[in-house]
Amino acid sequence: MIFQLGRYTIDVDVEKTKDFYASAVASNEICSCPCCQYFPNAIMSCSTIIVDFLNNLGVDPQKPGEVFGDKNNCSGWYHIVGTLLNGRVDVGVCDSSNAFIPDKTVDFIVWFDDDRNRMGWIEKNFPSPILEMSFSAKFPEQTNM
């Protein structure tokens, strides 16, 4: 399925991506750091637009390939079965000027890259072709999480 997301045009195999995430493990199940513990609940409560955006790509929002930072200000990535058709960004210039912002009311921005040499850790058995969606997120402090 073709998605036009700001400067990016991506071709995603939504079903293969969903199939992978169905058996993937959430960050809070494998890591005890504050960011990994906080992220799954924070992402689900930050914005229905963000959750729908990720779900439409076949991604389980609670299962990033990596998440790091502190619990309210974190970065990471999700992997998607797909290709980047248009919108490549040079290394080192991923900032808000070339990011896609799914919901302008929430501080959650993403970039897409298909260069395996620049990708972070890739989950075991992730199907090809691999597209990496990096993100930066700032969540409000939640006392109940």
Where are the language model's segments positioned?
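Long, hydrophobic N-terminal alpha-helical segment
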Residues: M1-M44
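Residues in well-ordered beta-strands of folded domains
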Residues: P34, V81, S134-S136
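Generic "edge-of-domain/loop-turn" microfeature
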Residues: Y38, L85-G87, P140-N144
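Amphipathic protein-protein interaction modules
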Residues: P64-G120
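Short acidic, gly/pro-rich beta-turn/loop elements at beta-sheet edges
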Residues: I43, D90, T143
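Glycine-rich, aromatic-bearing surface loops/beta-hairpins
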Residues: V106-M145
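Short, well-structured hydrophobic secondary-structure segments
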Residues: N28-W77
